[in-house]
A protein has these predicted regions:
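A subset of solvent-exposed loop/turn segments in beta-rich extracellular surface proteins, enriched
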Residues: 5-26, 137-158, 216-229
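Residues embedded in well-ordered regular secondary structure
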Residues: 1-72, 243
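Short, glycine/acidic-rich beta->alpha junctions
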Residues: 38-40, 84-89, 173, 292
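Short glycine-enriched, charge-decorated loop/helix-capping segments at active-site entrances
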Residues: 74-80
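Extracellular/periplasmic, surface-exposed regions of secreted and cell-surface proteins
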Residues: 93-102, 107-112, 117, 121, ...
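N-terminal, post-signal-peptide soluble/periplasmic segments
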Residues: 1-23, 83, 100-116, 121
Length: 399
């Protein structure tokens, strides 16, 4: 015994046991009050494919809906406060044989995603409090219908958090498309081929804040005196529903690649060459200056009877984030190899393949940061104000 007075008197314990005074001596089962027995998931999928010699296609449609466990009161709100996720997606793949030696391929993917949560944080507040707030902390409602509270739990009535705190809506969209055109020359130019690829990817993230505060009151009446006065004291005030929107991210990436190659052989001598140009344009958000990369490359490969191998490659890359005059980087490389298992004298039953190879090259790191002090812009309702400051004494080069 620490000599202190008991936290609960015998009268308190009896009132909790009998439930005779639920407003002054509550015993709330928070999980039963707030949670449903299940969280339904519905998913619908439709896909079909077809085509013939000239064209082939595949289409996939998907609808996904998942509800959360929280209960909601449709008589109080015209909107959903329960956690919910809806997703709609479409994917198509199409291959077209323009000629016997010319192929066109296009793939498209689009997705719309909408997540709803209560105005109070689910994991950081509602579900946490549901398992940590004592059952006798406060009544859900007072006798006059107001939300219950105490000086210790002033504004976090769990029912209010789940049902009366408004909601957040998180719309997300993704769109991707890539297309490739390939042609293989014939006749005197057999072995020569050309290809072009273009892709576009975008994603959009938004957060709509429709949360609001709710009013709570503490209540007291002597449970042992039927004629005692009721006492109410306001603990928290209601607030207007927010109408704020934040654009978390709107990024876009474009990629273009064009290549020409020529493969041929003379007896056991095999040659493969390829020239490539690529352009990459990435914008991280509506406020960011696009990051652009141009690259050109050449590669030549040779092998004799697939035994002796040699390769040479060189690439040049240009980044707009580097200092003017230092935006280009040149990166050569060479390599050689020997497939020993191709030799007539190599006869080892337990080894199917053995290869020796060596390579040397110079590479670069394009993740060294930007030469510009700021690669973003200030966004107002109607215009952009770009920041044009440069670093001084802190040049950035190819790393």
């Amino acid at each position: 015994n620490d000599g202190k007075s008991a936290l609960y008197s015998q009268t308190d314990l009896e009132l909790y046991r009998t439930g005779a005074s639920p407003y002054t001596h509550p015993n709330v089962d928070w999980q039963d009050l707030l949670l449903r027995n299940s969280a339904p998931i519905q998913q619908y999928n439709l896909n079909f494919s077809g085509g013939g010699k000239v064209a082939r296609y595949f289409v996939d449609l998907n609808v996904y809906n998942q509800d959360g466990f929280l209960k909601q009161d449709n008589s109080l709100n015209s909107y959903n406060t329960r956690e919910n996720v809806k997703k709609y997606s479409l994917r198509t793949n199409t291959d077209i044989a323009i000629t016997d030696h010319t192929q066109f391929k296009v793939n498209v993917f689009g997705q719309m995603y909408r997540e709803t949560t209560p105005g109070k944080a689910i994991m950081g507040s509602i579900y946490r409090d549901m398992y940590t707030v004592p059952n006798n902390a406060y009544p859900v409602f007072n006798p006059n219908g107001t939300l219950g509270a105490t000086p210790l739990y002033q504004s976090n009535n769990l029912y209010g958090q789940a049902v009366m705190s408004g909601y957040y809506l998180y719309p997300k969209t993704d769109f991707n498309i890539d297309a490739t055109l390939e042609h293989y020359f014939q006749g005197a130019l057999k072995g020569l081929y050309a290809s072009a690829t273009y892709s576009y990817n975008s994603s959009y993230r938004e957060a709509l804040n429709r949360s609001k505060g709710f009013e709570t009151w503490s209540y007291w009446k002597d449970p042992t005196d039927p004629n005692a006065m009721e006492e109410y004291l306001q603990m928290a005030s209601a607030s207007s529903q927010s109408n704020a929107t934040s654009y978390n991210r709107l990024n876009r990436m474009q990629y273009l690649e064009m290549a020409v190659g020529y493969d041929f052989n003379v007896k056991k001598n095999n040659f493969r060459t390829k020239i490539l140009y690529a352009y990459n344009d990435f914008t991280a958000s509506v406020k960011n200056i696009p990051l652009r990369k141009n690259s050109v490359g050449f590669r030549a490969e040779y092998d004799y009877d697939k035994r002796y191998l040699a390769e040479f490659a060189i690439a040049g890359m240009n980044l707009n984030t580097l200092k003017p005059g230092d935006q280009w980087g040149i990166f050569p490389s060479v390599g050689a190899g020997w497939n020993m298992h191709k030799e007539s004298w190599f006869d080892v039953a337990v080894i199917d393949a053995m290869k020796l190879r060596a390579s040397f090259g110079i590479n670069g790191n394009d993740g060294t940061g930007a030469y510009y002090r700021s690669s973003s812009a200030t966004l107002s309702d109607y215009y952009y104000t770009y920041l044009k400051y440069y670093k001084t004494g802190d040049n950035i080069y190819w790393g």
